[in-house]
Amino acid sequence: MNMGDEIVKKNKYEIDMCNGSIMDKLISFSLPLMLSGILQLMFNAVDIVVVGRFSGSEALAAVGSTTALINVFTNLFIGISLGANVLAARFYAAGKDEEMSETVHTSILLALISGIIMAFLGVIFARICLELMDTPEDVIDLSALYMRIYFLGMPFFMLSNYGAAILRAVGDTKRPLVFLIISGCANALLNLFFVIICHLSVAGVGIGTVISQLISCILVLRCLYQTEGSYQLRFSSLSINMEYLKQIFQVGLPAGIQSTVINFSNVLLQSSVNSFGSIAMAGYTAANNIFGFLYVSVNSVTQACMSFTSQNYGVRKPKRMDRVLVDCMILSFVVSFAMGCGAYFFGPQLLKIYTEDPKVIQCGMEILVYTTVTYFLCGQMDLFPGALRGMGRSGVPMILSIIGTVGLRIVWIFGIFPAHRSLKVLFISYPASWILTIIMQVTCFWFVRRKVHRQLLGETAE
């Protein structure tokens, strides 16, 4: 019997990633995660819709123009949570209860510290960063106000993210979905209350978001606290295990740096959009929200690939790791191509959800033309780094993603775009960067896979 075949008894929320058929379990894992991401974006879209409908285009541009900047601040620490997910999945599959418990408590304390740091940095540097992005004068005050309120909720946001990463590591994506539905509905209702009834505009949306993050945090931590088993949270046991913290950083820090740098390129892109004025900014805000639905759909498959790979790496099943990647490639293509085509053909109708302004809709469609039907490329691009992170290899994929995605976009923004100033030309940089990065990531994966297979097969033989 292979190590880990029957080590861990699964409860009704968990998925056995190491035995049996793969595709149906990938779908069972990915679907709640996909729905969670879509619902989160729908609830975030409520922010945009409410301020756009009831506070005007300036408020809409103010909230939307902060997205890329907020992601630069937060994605470093969210990326580190992937390290917690990989390490926890590996220990859980191998039945190492003590190591699993240490990982949980290290991760939660790390999340709290990270959230406090993020809150401090966001409140202090919000306006300075917005000025560096050339945010127009007519929206910068509202943008800074929204960012400062938003960042006050960072401790809650980080705790719920890291807690959900632990649950995903054991195959539980259903309870985080339920928690999101509860907190998201609260967010939507609070937004309507603060904006329409209290007339707080952008500030009301920010306050509603912070309260909903607190609700999500309480639900996730309560779930971990009441869980019986190796991933039970005991507040008295919160401490940092330096060895496991190092392993979390080895996988998570490169992923976080990659995400942060990529979002920095999006900040440069946002600055380029800002140069077209508030109409283009509003169009980009609406299109970016639609674009986000595509991302969370394929990202759910990437998360599944990483978690499944990590657990099978923990129980030394290299051939099953290969089958996981192939099935993930098929699933990602089907999901991303179908949703991309839908977003393209129904683009005008989807954009009208956010605004009735025909000029804003026209700008939004110029962006969607080149970033929807081709989005399956992005899905395939992310799978290979996801599989490598599941094996504990994160450094080289980070470097290649930065070179392929960020490097090309910077060259595009400062080299090609100034000579051909249009939104269409600006956003062709997306599929171009995806193609370049795929070529590099596949080459890297091939060499690392051979090394990992030899290592695992050698250990199994011993």
Segment roles from a protein language model:
Residues 60-120, 157-176, 283-341, 345-347, ...:
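Small-residue-rich hydrophobic transmembrane alpha-helices
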Residues 28-47, 149, 160, 183, ...:
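Transmembrane helical elements of multi-pass membrane transporters/channels
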Residues 1-30, 88-153, 197-253, 309-374, ...:
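Short alpha-helical transmembrane segments in multi-pass integral membrane proteins
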Residues 72-75, 187-191, 217-221, 293-296, ...:
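Hydrophobic transmembrane alpha-helices of multi-pass small-molecule transporters
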Residues 27, 31, 43, 80, ...:
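Residue-level signal for transmembrane alpha-helical positions in Major Facilitator Superfamily
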Residues 81, 150-168, 176-187, 205-220, ...:
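Short runs within selected transmembrane alpha-helices of multi-pass transporters and secretion channels
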Residues 42-61, 130-137, 193-200, 260-293, ...:
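Helix-terminus/linker motif at the lipid-water interface of multi-pass membrane proteins
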Residues 19, 23-42, 46, 69-76, ...:
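Residue-level signal for short hydrophobic patches within transmembrane helices
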